[in-house]
Amino acid sequence: MSMILSASVIRVRDGLPLSASTDYEQSTGMQECRKYFKMLSRKLAQFPDRCTLKTGRYNINFISSLGVSYMMLCSENYPNVLAFSFLDELQKEFITTYNMMKTNTAVRPYCFIEFDNFIQRTKQRYNNPRSLSTKINLSDMQMEIKLRPPYQIPMCELGSANGVTSAFSVDCKGAGKISSAHQRLEPATLSGIVAFILSLLCGALNLIRGFHAIESLLQSDGEDLNYIIAFFLGTAACLYQCYLLVYYTSWRNVKSFLTFGLICLCNMYLYELRNLWQLFFHVTVGAFVTLQIWLRQAQGKAPDHDV
């Protein structure tokens, strides 16, 4: 029978459980899934805002927003659209009931345990689809999941917790490359936003000059083809710096330094077409963006809390 079995509300930055449903089975499979809950709660900051972990007979789904994650355990054949609609209802009610100040300053586990009453009522409704009053909104949720499906977490990304190691850890090499692409960076600073805008500006300037160079070449004005290549390489380098500033990738810092080197080489080649102030601007912006990429690192690992 497809149904929701339990749900939890957890603070993302440190995995502190804020509330949870209290009626759960004591079967071996359920106890194993609760161990997966613990492992996930420690690493929520490293995952995207909508994820699914398949554990065999059960699925763990969660969404994260405003520093709080909403997790649920359901049977493997429970519809995805209902699962994430259920989590969306929990999120809306929790945000309405508790302000961010309370959730950010909470120090005691399960300090919002009274929220369990709403979890239980909502769980009962979603376990009986005939009683659902949200059928109108399910089409919107279904379209959202289709356009932006939840990230499927490989077992090996969980690592180990309290002596329990995932049976799939030995096959983690390939999945590790996937997880790095979804790892979250620290929040953007004002200087980081300025660097992003300046890099886009430099890329746009290079692109415009590149098209003008193509126009001159077509008019047979003797424009060097290598100048066109240099302008477009400079554009690509600036855009890639923007990408590195926003997203986490493996060897991110090395890539940023190599990209900055390409920017310097392009501007050296374009020395005859730009004055010193233009060259100084492009190189300085490239160096500034490289520094911001280096400063904005991946979020650290959260400490343990029992869920």
UniProtKB/Swiss-Prot annotation:
It is a multi-pass membrane protein. Pfam families: Longin (PF13774). It comes from the Eukaryota. The modification Phosphoserine is found at residues 6, 8. May be involved in vesicle transport between the ER and the Golgi complex. Residues 8-119 form the Longin domain. CDD domains: Longin (cd14824). The keyword Endoplasmic reticulum applies. The chain crosses the membrane at residues 188-208, 227-247, 254-271, 275-295. InterPro entries: Longin-like_dom_sf (IPR011012), Longin_dom (IPR010908), Sec22a/c (IPR043546). The gene is Sec22a. Belongs to the synaptobrevin family. One of its GO terms (cellular component) is endoplasmic reticulum membrane. Keywords: Acetylation, Coiled coil, Endoplasmic reticulum, ER-Golgi transport, Membrane, Phosphoprotein, Protein transport, Transmembrane, Transmembrane helix, Transport. One of its GO terms (biological process) is protein transport. The modification N-acetylserine is found at residue 2. The keyword Transport applies. It is found in: Endoplasmic reticulum membrane. This is Vesicle-trafficking protein SEC22a. Residues 2-187, 248-253, 296-307 are cytoplasmic.
